[in-house]
Amino acid sequence: MTKLIFMGTPDFSATVLKGLLTDDRYEILAVVTQPDRAVGRKKVIQETPVKQAAKEAGLSIYQPEKLSGSPEMEELMKLGADGIVTAAFGQFLPSKLLDSMDFAVNVHASLLPRHRGGAPIHYALIQGDEEAGVTIMEMVKEMDAGDMISRRSIPITDEDNVGTLFEKLALVGRDLLLDTLPAYIAGDIKPEPQDTSQVTFSPNIKPEEEKLDWNKTNRQLFNQIRGMNPWPVAHAFLKGDRFKIYEALPVEGQGNPGEILSIGKKELIVATAEGALSLKQVQPAGKPKMDIASFLNGVGRTLTVGERFGD
């Protein structure tokens, strides 16, 4: 039985961990995840999905603020693990820890070398990629730069957003890891170096990148909106207030970018640089998320054709 330390944080990682727990070829000696955080306006302390999964399985849990140089790292090195599996952990692993293991692999939610970094699923959508995927790779000091052990792709559909693609790729990552790990541990797979000329980076989304620029095409804005749904959520400004847009569809239309072209009972169409967007799910300032019909029947009922959204 191969003894593992698992490291991860969000739901994506929890799905991978649960997959490993179903396979009797592996024993999880410890789980490392990010510390509990205060979230929301009420600052409620929230455990990571990986911590919740580990607690349900009765596993030992470590939550160092920073792994490098921590007492927790020294403890982990004394457990006698054969290797480390990480999936969206959110911290760099120290070379000292990596060097103490027979192997260390990462489950990364992109088709490397494209989309290295912390937001690969977001950028796959924002940049209009036709496919997404998962790469199992060896861990090295440089971020997402290790040799590739295996890759698996799935198509991106127009119905996908960050939430749906996360769910799909979590299952792909779980299955690909379980399919790959035995042969890799046995030495039957020769990892492939990444083509550095094809590397792109997908860092965490910055707040200023959440703003919609109506001078882009309807397709570009459609991809940005779904590439930030359900988090961090794209926004524009309407009458000076922040206006979040969760869902919109590209449609035909022509006008000044940001101009309201049409208002119906269940329709609000806004011009872009090329074509238009039909807004479907929005959140006005100080209000909950709602469908466009609810918005137009409520706080949006005073809108008129010709008014403009800011960016």
Swiss-Prot record:
Catalyzed reactions per annotation: L-methionyl-tRNA(fMet) + (6R)-10-formyltetrahydrofolate = N-formyl-L-methionyl-tRNA(fMet) + (6S)-5,6,7,8-tetrahydrofolate + H(+)
Primary enzyme class: transferase
GO molecular function: methionyl-tRNA formyltransferase activity
Source organism, top-level taxon: Bacteria
Keyword Amino-acid biosynthesis: no
Enzyme Commission designation: 2.1.2.9
Keyword Isomerase: no
PROSITE patterns hit by this protein: GART
Pfam families: Formyl_trans_C (PF02911), Formyl_trans_N (PF00551)
Residues at which (6S)-5,6,7,8-tetrahydrofolate binds: 110-113
Gene3D superfamilies membership: Formyl transferase, C-terminal domain, Formyl transferase, N-terminal domain
InterPro entries: Fmt (IPR005794), Formyl_trans_C (IPR005793), Formyl_trans_C_sf (IPR037022), Formyl_transf_N (IPR002376), Formyl_transf_N_sf (IPR036477), Formyl_transferase-like_C_sf (IPR011034), GART_AS (IPR001555), Met-tRNA-FMT_C (IPR044135)
GO cellular component: cytosol
UniProt keywords, alphabetically: Protein biosynthesis, Transferase
SUPFAM superfamilies per UniProt: FMT C-terminal domain-like (SSF50486), Formyltransferase (SSF53328)
Family statement drawn from the similarity comment of this UniProt entry: Belongs to the Fmt family.
Described purpose of this protein according to its UniProt entry: Attaches a formyl group to the free amino group of methionyl-tRNA(fMet). The formyl group appears to play a dual role in the initiator identity of N-formylmethionyl-tRNA by promoting its recognition by IF2 and preventing the misappropriation of this tRNA by the elongation apparatus.
Protein name: Methionyl-tRNA formyltransferase
